[in-house]
């Protein structure tokens, strides 16, 4: 088994080929996690789970608009009976899937110091990353009666040993790479040069990377990676280009991205020929007061409006929802 570091840009020739007729699809991923203060230092305790009560409405909404969410579940969620009941019902009915999301600071074993660096699971010692992941993966399978096939490292925190760990655990898809983004200033990965198209992590084509979709828009979009590298040293450098509408980095998320911006990102991604557009957001945003993106009920309603508009645009472009299982099958799994 030869599996390189997922922190590195893949070598040429690793792009995944999808089966004829697959077309262009959309996958909705939900970072399904505890509520915590994003502005405060990381803590093992003191989190909440009250927003779980809002998940049934979201699931019903998804079924109405034709979305098929993948709930990427972390340790506090899988330990919560209400969350397991709500998500498990959708999984059993075939209207949702469940995957793994590792937040190491709230996931046993608790053998590391809680810090910003250690909030990226890939920065942990190899054995500790594996121990935390294995406990979580096994708990998810036991709780939902379904073997998870997809993984996202919390905070997109892959590491040099993550790829063989995922392969050994039978994970078929990773979706931790957030292309065009750089977290190295916090001690995390730099994905600014990683491709947007799905690619194989390993030459044996057992582990597929499905990057979270972002796109550069504007006259200077070809210079996007360079401009963002300069921003590391000049924090206000990029904002001027954005304000003048010369360059925008558009992530396909309702968190901090307007529907109009997202639809530009959708159009760019479709025109670029991406086989799968990967949308993402955090489950606590489904209720007010838990994330910076939904401080009020009105902002929660705006999130639903965002999904209505974006999925209508996708439908108009002929882009249908897909599942993790369909992606695995379409790439030869």
Where are these regions (language model features)?
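Active-site-adjacent pocket scaffolds in enzyme catalytic domains
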Residues: 2-9, 13, 153-272
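Hydrophobic faces of well-ordered beta-strands that scaffold small-molecule active sites
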Residues: 26-30, 69-71, 98-102, 149-151, ...
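Surface-exposed, active-site-proximal loop segments in enzymatic domains
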Residues: 38-44, 110-122, 289-295
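Generic structural signal for well-ordered alpha-helices
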Residues: 55-59, 84-88, 130-137, 163, ...
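Metal-dependent polysaccharide deacetylase catalytic core of the NodB/CE4 family, i.e.
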Residues: 75-157, 205, 214-216, 283-284
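Histidine/acidic-residue-rich catalytic or RNA/ligand-binding cores of hydrolases
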Residues: 109-110, 185-190, 223, 287-294
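C-terminal domain-boundary segment and adjacent tail
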Residues: 239-333
């Amino acid at each position: 088994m030869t599996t390189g570091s997922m922190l590195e840009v893949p070598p040429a020739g690793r792009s995944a080929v999808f089966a004829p007729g697959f077309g262009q699809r959309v996958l909705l991923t939900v970072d399904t996690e505890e509520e915590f203060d994003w502005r405060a230092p990381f803590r093992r305790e003191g989190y909440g789970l009250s927003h779980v009560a809002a998940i049934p409405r979201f699931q019903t909404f998804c079924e109405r608009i034709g979305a098929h969410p993948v709930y990427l579940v972390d340790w506090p969620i899988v330990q919560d009976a209400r969350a397991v009941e709500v998500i498990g019902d959708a999984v059993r009915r075939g209207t949702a899937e469940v995957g793994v999301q590792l937040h190491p600071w709230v996931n046993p074993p608790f053998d590391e110091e809680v810090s910003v660096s250690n909030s990226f699971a890939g920065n942990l010692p190899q054995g500790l990353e594996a121990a935390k992941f294995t406990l979580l993966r096994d708990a998810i399978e036991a709780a939902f009666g379904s073997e998870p096939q997809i993984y996202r490292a919390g905070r997109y925190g892959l590491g040099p040993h993550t790829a063989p760990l995922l392969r050994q655990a039978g994970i078929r898809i990773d979706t931790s790479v957030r292309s065009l983004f750089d977290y190295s200033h916090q001690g995390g990965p730099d994905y600014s040069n990683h491709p947007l198209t799905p690619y194989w992590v390993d030459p044996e084509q057992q582990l597929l990377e499905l990057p979270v979709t972002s796109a550069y828009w504007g006259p200077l979009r070809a210079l996007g990676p360079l401009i963002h590298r300069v921003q590391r040293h000049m924090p206000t450098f990029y904002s001027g280009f954005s304000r003048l509408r010369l360059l925008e980095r558009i992530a396909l998320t309702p968190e901090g991205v307007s529907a109009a911006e997202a639809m530009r990102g959708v159009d760019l991604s479709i025109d670029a020929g991406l086989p799968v557009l990967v949308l993402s957001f955090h489950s606590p945003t489904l209720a007010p007061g838990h994330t910076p993106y939904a401080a009020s009920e009105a902002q929660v309603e705006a999130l639903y409006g965002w999904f209505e508009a974006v999925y209508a645009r996708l439908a108009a472009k002929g882009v249908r929802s897909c599942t993790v299982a369909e992606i695995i099958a379409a790439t030869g799994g």
